Amino acid sequence: MIETGVIHGRFQVLHLKHMEYILAAKMRCRKLYIGITNPDSMHTRDSVNDINRSAKSANPLTYFERYEMIRGAMQEFRVPESEYDVIPFPISCPEYILQYAPKEAVY
């Protein structure tokens, strides 16, 4: 088991497959950082893979709404709060990721 792991996703809207992904990652580390991509409009750029991915219509929920959904789901799955954290993950601006996520983690 590794000490610290980081995963990321948009989580627009959080669903069971997202939870399978999150819980599978949590099983592999003591502390998991769950990164929310496209946390705000300043850190969102057009995706070369899917031009609709960064559209406002494809991102109806705010960072805070997604944060609350993830925390609520983690409580429902009985994951202790001390074993995870939910963070912004500005995937479109990779130079800022380490402002939010630990450098020494496994990504």
Q: What residue ranges belong to the model's regions?
A:
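Nucleotidyltransferase catalytic core that binds NTPs
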Residues: M1-Y107
